[in-house]
């Protein structure tokens, strides 16, 4: 199949220029100022439009079994929502139950995804327990047959996904050995569990309890701790869903000291805030329950966008994990039973454009970087993904920077009956989405084929992740001091050395040296 994109402005992370793009058999085969159409060639006109790399969402949870429920967006509906929003690749998470084989869990996720995806996808692996078998299986899944190059560790969800600090540290040592990226959900799970118990016993059962049980300081503390431990392990670290200024500051602090740490804000945290948890409508408040929670500071979304612009945060994602109103209502008497998760995979690109480019905070090239290219580089699929270039996959979006749309549950493609961005008008709209040379979204209509997406193996040893690690490791090597042998004196020698010392008995005097005290009792 061949396709020609005419008269558009190509935007990569490092350049913008007018050119045509010729696609054949899923690859970009030519980029030139004026490519002439040939008979039978499908032509897409992109006059006054931007031609950008398809978005890559590096953090989704499609059909995740969680808190006794299963996320509503499966790999079919979830990837349809993705392409409708201009995202052409997702990276989902294999999450084994505690003690489960990584290989068994991997096969289960592939069995769910392969028959359903309408765009390409990769996988990351969560480590929910630690043993020699887990370490061995980590090595196995980083091989080409499995294609995993990152491992996620939860410092929250005590008793379910959470690992202890020593397990986290051992896991990072193994990641460093395998040249795989460690990813972390940074919250203090032990303190959260205590706070939940206290709040419930105090009669606070509504969604406001969720945010009160997880104050921002606990995210900041866990982020700082995770960065410190990763530095000691000389392991690159990727902090998922950075939701607060404190967590972002912890990342910046360690990067300034030379640590290899990446920070990922998500669409929800860039476009809304935690005031919703205090809405008098219980269901409205419950819809926004996710972990870490949205910041209660209304200035945080803008601050996170400015940190993206400054390079202190590095790429955007969604943590898309959707539960409908019925599922959310299962926690009506206990906020700890509200399934955690929100939507985002369909609206991320428009949200970032609106709050970033349209607001004058980032330029279109930075937009491409934080929505596509950085993810491709970090997860080692660049320039196959994340770039408009000859030889790259034809994952392309025709972007109308001047158009607007109003986000609504009535028009979105998620499998849920609400949208956390409901009523928000955003600038920047994907008019056409192309996955591997196939048009999958055009004129407001899906043109997808279930199962047409492919699994993308992600090899370890990404250059942007590991290029600084080896030299840093040399600087961190233990230092041994070479000394002459120490010969301790024997007990007899020590006794003889003290033989001539005169020991005087204690003598009590009426007037001690320095005179008598003037204090009278």
Give the location of each predicted region.
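Histidine/acidic residue-rich metal-binding segments in metalloenzymes
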Residues: 133-316, 321, 333
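Peripheral, non-catalytic segments of secretory and membrane proteins
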Residues: 480-521
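Histidine-rich, glycine-flanked metal-binding segment
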Residues: 2-4, 10-53
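Metal-associated gating/positioning segment near the N- to mid-region
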Residues: 47-116, 133
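His/Asp/Glu-enriched, well-ordered alpha-helical/loop segment
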Residues: 205-225, 229-234, 310, 314-316, ...
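Divalent metal-coordination and catalytic microenvironments
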Residues: 8, 26, 48, 59, ...
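Alpha-helix-loop-beta-strand connector modules within alpha/beta enzyme cores
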Residues: 103-119, 169-184, 347
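C-terminal cap of metal-dependent C-N hydrolases
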Residues: 330-334, 340, 390-455
């Amino acid at each position: 199949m061949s396709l020609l994109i005419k008269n558009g402005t190509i935007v990569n992370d490092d350049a913008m220029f007018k050119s045509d793009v010729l696609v054949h058999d899923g690859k970009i085969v030519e980029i030139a100022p004026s490519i002439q159409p040939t008979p039978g060639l499908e032509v897409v006109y992109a006059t006054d439009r931007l031609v950008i790399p398809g978005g890559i969402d590096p953090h989704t949870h499609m059909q995740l079994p969680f808190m006794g429920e299963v996320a509503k967006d499966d790999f079919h509906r979830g990837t349809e929502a993705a392409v409708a929003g201009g995202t052409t690749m997702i990276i989902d998470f294999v999450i084994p139950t505690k003690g489960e084989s990584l290989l068994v869990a991997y096969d289960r996720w592939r069995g769910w995804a392969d028959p359903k995806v309408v765009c390409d996808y990769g996988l990351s692996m969560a480590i929910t327990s630690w043993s020699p078998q887990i370490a061995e299986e980590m090595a196995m899944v980083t091989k080409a047959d499995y294609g995993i190059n990152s491992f996620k560790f939860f410092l929250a969800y005590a008793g379910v996904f959470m690992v202890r600090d020593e397990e986290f540290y051992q896991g990072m040592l193994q990641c460093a050995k395998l040249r795989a990226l460690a990813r972390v959900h940074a919250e203090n799970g032990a303190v959260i569990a205590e706070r939940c118990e206290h709040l419930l016993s105090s009669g606070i059962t509504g969604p406001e309890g969720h945010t009160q049980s997880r104050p921002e300081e606990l995210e900041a503390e866990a982020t700082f701790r995770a960065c410190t431990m990763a530095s000691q392990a000389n392991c690159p670290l990727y902090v998922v869903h950075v939701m607060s200024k404190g967590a972002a500051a912890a990342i910046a602090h360690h990067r300034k000291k030379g640590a290899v740490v990446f920070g990922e804000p998500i669409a929800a945290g860039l476009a809304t805030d935690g005031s919703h948890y205090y809405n008098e409508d219980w269901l409205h408040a419950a819809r926004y329950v996710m972990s870490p929670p949205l910041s209660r500071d209304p200035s945080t979304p803008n601050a996170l966008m400015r940190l993206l612009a400054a390079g202190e945060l590095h790429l955007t994602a969604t943590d898309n994990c959707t539960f409908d109103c019925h599922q959310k209502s299962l926690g009506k008497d206990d906020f700890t039973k509200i399934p955690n998760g929100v939507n985002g995979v369909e609206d991320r690109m428009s949200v970032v454009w609106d709050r970033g480019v349209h607001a004058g905070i980032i330029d279109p090239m930075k937009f491409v970087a934080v929505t596509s290219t950085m993810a491709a580089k970090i997860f080692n699929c660049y320039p196959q993904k994340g770039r408009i270039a000859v030889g790259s996959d034809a994952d392309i979006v025709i972007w109308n920077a001047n158009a607007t749309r109003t986000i609504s549950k009535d028009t979105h493609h998620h499998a849920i009956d609400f949208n956390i961005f409901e009523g928000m008008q955003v600038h920047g709209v994907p008019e056409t989405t192309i996955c591997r040379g196939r048009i999958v979204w055009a004129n407001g209509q899906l043109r997808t084929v279930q199962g047409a997406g492919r699994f993308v193996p992600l090899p370890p040893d990404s250059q942007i992740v590991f290029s600084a690690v080896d030299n840093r490791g040399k600087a961190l090597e233990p230092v041994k001091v070479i000394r002459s042998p120490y010969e301790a004196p024997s007990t007899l020698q020590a006794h003889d050395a003290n033989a001539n010392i005169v020991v005087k008995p204690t003598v009590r005097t009426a007037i001690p040296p320095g005179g008598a005290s003037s204090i009278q009792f």
